């Protein structure tokens, strides 16, 4: 039985979510006396990180193959890291989850939205984030941030047009989700950081009262 709090951070490449999580990981190890574990997808545990490395190498794989590899990584990640943490009443904060698969593999790479959603249902077995925070960013700002990276991979969205398509897909999928909050990630990084930490802190405190 899940006891902890599962929080997912989503957003287009260049939204600042990964930088946010690196900073939060350094500054917050617990909230309201609840320990926090941080993770990412694909990855998060030994087997899942190995699958991540494989995904990064396979730039020309079929979109459904890629979606299945993400599912394999996610299954191991949930079993080995996320679910044990939640069962120990910890806060699990993850960089990306199933919504990323729906959008990137299902819609953008045309593996089929319903197909990708269905195969992920087998893996997640009904588990949903208690809170999803979408870092919504102006495509021009995201594209600039990506261009300034020292390294990039084939999963990164390079053009403003592609970023905008992904952004719109995120907004469409999450706009009516009562467990999702959309924040303006085009603001300066310190403002975004303070805002999101406050959202997470208040959510965890209110979650304990319910």
From Swiss-Prot:
Protein task: Phosphorylation of dTMP to form dTDP in both de novo and salvage pathways of dTTP synthesis.
PANTHER family given in the database record: THYMIDYLATE KINASE, UMP-CMP KINASE 2, MITOCHONDRIAL
Protein EC: 2.7.4.9
SUPFAM superfamilies, per the entry: P-loop containing nucleoside triphosphate hydrolases
GO molecular function (one): dTMP kinase activity
A Gene Ontology biological process term: dTTP biosynthetic process
GO cellular component: cytosol
Protein name according to UniProt: Thymidylate kinase
Keywords, ordered alphabetically: ATP-binding, Kinase, Nucleotide biosynthesis, Nucleotide-binding, Transferase
Family named by the database record: Belongs to the thymidylate kinase family.
Broad class of enzyme this protein falls into: transferase
CDD domains: TMPK
Catalytic activity: dTMP + ATP = dTDP + ADP
Binding residues for ATP: 11-18
């Amino acid at each position: 039985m899940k006891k902890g709090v599962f929080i997912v951070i989503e957003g287009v490449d260049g939204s600042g979510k990964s930088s946010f999580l690196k900073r939060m990981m350094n500054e917050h190890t617990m909230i309201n006396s609840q320990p926090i574990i941080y993770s990412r997808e694909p990855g998060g545990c030994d087997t899942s990180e190995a699958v991540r490395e494989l995904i990064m190498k396979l730039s020309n794989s079929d979109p459904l193959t890629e979606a299945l590899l993400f599912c394999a990584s996610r299954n191991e990640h949930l079993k080995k890291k996320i679910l044990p943490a939640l069962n120990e009443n910890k806060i699990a904060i993850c960089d990306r989850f199933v919504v990323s698969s729906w959008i990137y593999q299902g819609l953008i790479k045309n593996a089929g939205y319903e197909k990708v959603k269905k195969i992920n249902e087998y893996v997640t077995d009904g588990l949903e984030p208690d809170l999803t925070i979408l870092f919504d960013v102006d495509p021009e700002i995201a594209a600039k941030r990506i261009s300034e990276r020292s390294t990039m991979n084939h999963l990164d969205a390079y053009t403003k047009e592609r970023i905008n398509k992904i952004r719109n897909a995120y907004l469409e999928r999450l706009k009516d989700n009562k467990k999702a909050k959309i924040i303006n990630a085009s603001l300066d990084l310190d403002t975004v950081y303070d805002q999101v930490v406050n959202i997470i802190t208040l959510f965890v405190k209110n979650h304990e009262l319910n």
